[in-house]
Amino acid sequence: MTYKKLYSSTIFNRELELSQDYNTNSTAFQYDFLSDDFDLNRDSSNFKMPTSLFKNLRDDKPIIFYMNPPYGTTGKLAKDGTAKKIDISKINLFMKANHYGNASQQLYAQFVTRVIKLADDFDLTNVYLAMFSGIRYLAGGNYWLKFDQHFFKQFTYKYGMIFNAGEFSGTSSMWPIGFTIYKLNKNENNIPKEFELSIMTRTDSSINNVGTKTVNLVEKDSLSSWLRNPAITGTPMPDGSYPKLTSAMKESKRNNSRCTFYEGSMGCLMNSANNVAEGTTNGGVWLATSGIYHDHGVNVFDKNFDKVVADFAIRRSIAPTWVNAQDNFTKPNTNSPIYSSFIGDATVFSLFDTASNQASYRNWNGYTNCNKPGRWINQWFFIDQGKIETEAMRKKQNDVAYDAYGDKNRYVYLKLQNMTLSKEAQNVLDLATKLYFKQLKYRKKAILKYPDMSLNAWDIGWYQMKLIDRVFPSKVMQELKSAIIILKEKIAREYAQDLIEK
């Protein structure tokens, strides 16, 4: 295709060379779109961009910004609580100063905002924006709200499609890429509530439109908002008095936890975003028995326990596809006749999913949640304390018997006594109980194998049970894992699938 005027720019010289190979008639130039010529306007005389491009902007020539910006953030936390720094651009600072909200850290939002700024600074009137990007800004709820308000007051949506991100080399095939087209329309007052996107797939011989997908700019009764409202807090535990976890048995490398942990809390639910992929493939949803490193944590108390396990089960049970990966969840109907049964399923599932990082700790930096130094109990435990004490003594597992002596039953065990469970949930619970007592006879040896994993605790969690199974494998574990999958599929089929926003 031949263009009358084609300018191509990138910050990387190698990409610039590739661009020139594909577009031999283009004017290619190295340029940091997010920072270079930042205060440029019609009256400027000193600039880095080609003079002909500056004149086109100054003279308000029709222009199409065609972009494939990078996907990343300026401060994303790694799983160990550290952050990989991406250089802060001038447009990032501009967005923060002009109230673009949380989306200011998203790189593709920064590229879009630079287009908005150029249109304003040059008082342009005939601008189109065509871009490849993620589609979270079309369905990202409160995170994207302020950015969307800025953007859609300036640009009108004209067309959009999604396709599998795997079409780009070296990119995961588990999420969608959007290609969207917008026209400048300043002072647009009718900000859209939803967008229809064509779903495109490719075969060896053709590209096919296989349907449409509607995404909602404003979340409808979001699951995440339902979980967090009303907020339940308490007396904060002093910094340094509790483990700040990145997983079941690892602490964050950060000095300060982003999630306040309160006295009396049974742990935290990590609950990032509100979409399908974040809860599964992205590791944005998991449970722990203490504080966590991330600011998306929700403390767990009796008052919000049902909400916590409901959110966890809903978000962990759906298998993501590239089409639904960015879809949001709505809140469940608590008045439904099946809600109480669902809570039973969710409670059991929350104990044994791969993201169930509940554990019990002994002699770990003196941490305590029960007024006994070095003793951090697991309120998510599911078997009667008396039975364990008796059985541990019978099997001469003195460490466990001593740990259980004089203790009391945990919250989840007591809660389960008042529930009528489905056959699928009961089967999981029965097999988990059977596995616990089978493993009990190996506990001394397991303690020697993993001396720092608190396996002397009578109220160990799922992670610790899996550790024991590594060295003392059991057929019961395989039966249990199969039963967990059946329960997970039931939750997805009978509850969670209906809560994906349509």
Question: Where do the protein language model's features map onto the residues?
Answer:
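Class I S-adenosyl-L-methionine
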Residues: A139-G141, K153-E196
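A short acidic (Asp/Glu
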Residues: E17-Q20, L40, G75-A78, A139-F147, ...
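Helicase-associated low-complexity regulatory tails and linkers flanking the ATPase motor
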Residues: T214-M270, N274-A277, G284
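Flexible, glycine-/basic-rich loop-and-beta segments that form/coincide
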Residues: M174-K244
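Conserved proline-anchored active-site loop of SAM-dependent methyltransferases
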Residues: M1, D32-S35, S44-K90, Y108, ...
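Conserved Class I SAM-dependent methyltransferase catalytic core
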Residues: K96-N164
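C-terminal target-recognition/interaction regions appended to catalytic cores
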Residues: E251-K502
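Conserved S-adenosyl-L-methionine
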Residues: M1-F38
